[in-house]
Amino acid sequence: MFRHLFATVFLLFSFVNADFMFSYDNKNEYIEPMSVNASLSATTYLYTYSQSGHHFSGPAYDGSYIDTYGCCSGQSGSCRNNPSCQCQVSVGPLPQGTYSLGNMMTFKGMQYSYELYPASSNNMCGRSGFLIHGGACSGNPSEGCIVIENESTRYKIKSGATLKVVS
């Protein structure tokens, strides 16, 4: 009984304080607070975004799983979601590589947005300033940022997590 109560208290606390988290595999396991640049193990909050697949996936902070298609990155036209255009500034998708997610914020009125911090090993092609944010992929909402239209999906993304961008 005490163990269940202990886990429930920590679970409720994790919704209030985003700096604390549980591993996806074991919700009773406490993980130390993380900074934005903290490295994460492969079993802890690893998201994947496929440029050409328009697909974002990974474990949500609440224990559910995010598996959403229809995301976009890059300006509309032949370069949107096109890996061969990733080095075209303000046109192509977010360059492939590994990123750390910043804290949840509001960007241009869109709640549940996250800054993306590239790993030093990424080839950024002289590009910077990427985010995950909302908007309608039917327009031109992105110069390379990842656009996830559904607000409740963005809300479930864990700040401080790692994102792997693949072709």
Please provide the spans of the model-predicted regions.
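Sec-dependent signal peptide cleavage junction
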Residues: 17-24
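Exported/periplasmic cell-wall-interacting domains
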Residues: 88, 92-98, 102-167
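A short, compositionally biased
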Residues: 17, 48-55, 109-111, 157-159
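Secreted/periplasmic proteins
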Residues: 24-98, 104-105, 135, 140-141
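Hydrophobic h-region of N-terminal signal peptides that target proteins for export
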Residues: 9-17
